[in-house]
Amino acid sequence: WKVQHNILHHTYTNITGHDEDIHPVGILRFSPNEKLKGIHRFQHLYAWFFYGLMTIQWLTTKDFRGLKRYNDMGFVKTGYKKEFIKLVFWKIIYLGYVLALPMIFVDNFSFIEIIVGFLSMHFIAGLILGLIFQPAHVMETSEFPMPNQDMTIENTWAVHQMNNTANFGNKNFFLNWYAGGLNFQI
């Protein structure tokens, strides 16, 4: 999270090839700088399903791939093996209290019901995260600058953030409460 969000996303917001938040699975396209494929014309129909899988992807693959990639980039300062063990440990703890404890101590639900509940919770969480985070950066007013030959962009970091971030639903009391203010990005 520190590397992916705080360093890469907030330093390189909406810069293709650097901001992982605008480079999802190949079937989705968030940046006009990404290659346009025929399937993308239906993205408005199927994106919701992939948003719903977001937290399952984090749990199963994204964190592991990210750790490897960030180690290769030199961001992992405490040692790859140590961070990998910590990552596996915390995923086991999470799965233990979210899946194993209910299976052991809750008699009212079957194994299948607990798994369906777990997957439903993750699907809804991913959908909510997608619905809150995408409007903050992937709007018609957002810019998607490409670095020049010197690997720089023309604006300062602060101006770049203002040009690539959007508030939404500012006057919607329920959305403000529900999103915890995440709809106020600027």
Positions of PLM-derived features:
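Membrane-embedded catalytic scaffold of the fatty acid hydroxylase/desaturase
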Residues: 1-79, 148-186
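Juxtamembrane/interface segments at transmembrane-helix termini
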Residues: 3, 66-67, 112-116, 127-148
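Intrinsic-disorder/low-complexity, polar/charged segments
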Residues: 37, 80-84, 110, 137, ...
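Alpha-helical bilayer-embedded segments of polytopic membrane proteins, i.e.
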Residues: 44-56, 79-132
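Generic beta-strand/beta-sheet core signal
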Residues: 90, 136-137, 185
